[in-house]
């Protein structure tokens, strides 16, 4: 519930067009639908209309392939599939590379965040890119998904504060 609220607000702040929650179990979809219904149609919409706006971009998909297909149908273009990890892979790219792809490229991006045990290495090997880890000032880099999403979306779509005088 908190991940849905917090990440949807972060996505809305950075103008992400869709926040896909990918999970194969129908019971998870029912939970998501119940949460969304409360905030978009129930008392929650009256209580906090901004949250209803942020949650309007949340979509459930049973698997990654379905999310890719939905994005391709919506945009007419096959998205890059990009994920994050605390480790380096052969297809790891920098935030500046991916930011440039988003600004200048003509393909949408499906950015995946794993939770719990993350995404299986075999699955990750099939993705177009893996973003470099988020490094802090020490060797610990195991962020919760909410923090990682906020930091990474800011790096990819936020204000280029470092270019200002």
Specify the residue positions occupied by each region the protein language model found.
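Structured adenosyl-cofactor binding patch, chiefly the S-adenosyl-L-methionine
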Residues: 117-165
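Residues that form or flank phosphate/diphosphate-binding pockets in enzymes
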Residues: 30, 93, 140
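A short acidic, often aromatic-flanked loop/helix-cap motif at beta-alpha or helix-coil junctions
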Residues: 64-69, 89-90, 137-140
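RNA substrate-binding interface of SAM-dependent RNA methyltransferases
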Residues: 1-85, 150-153, 157, 161
């Amino acid at each position: 519930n908190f991940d849905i609220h917090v990440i949807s607000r972060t996505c809305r702040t950075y103008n992400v067009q869709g926040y896909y929650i990918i999970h194969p179990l129908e019971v998870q979809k029912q939970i998501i639908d119940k949460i969304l219904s409360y905030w978009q149609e129930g008392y929650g919409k009256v209580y906090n209309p901004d949250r209803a706006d942020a949650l309007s971009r949340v979509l459930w998909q049973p698997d990654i392939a379905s999310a890719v297909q939905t994005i391709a149908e919506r945009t007419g273009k096959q998205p890059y599939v990009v994920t994050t990890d605390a480790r380096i892979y052969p297809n790891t790219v920098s935030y500046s590379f991916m930011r440039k792809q988003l600004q200048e490229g003509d393909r949408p991006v499906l950015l995946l965040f794993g939770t719990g045990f993350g995404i299986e290495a075999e699955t990750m090997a099939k993705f177009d890119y893996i973003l470099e880890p988020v490094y802090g000032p020490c060797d610990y880099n195991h962020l919760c998904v909410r923090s990682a999403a906020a930091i990474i979306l800011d790096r990819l779509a936020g204000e280029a504060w470092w270019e200002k005088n």
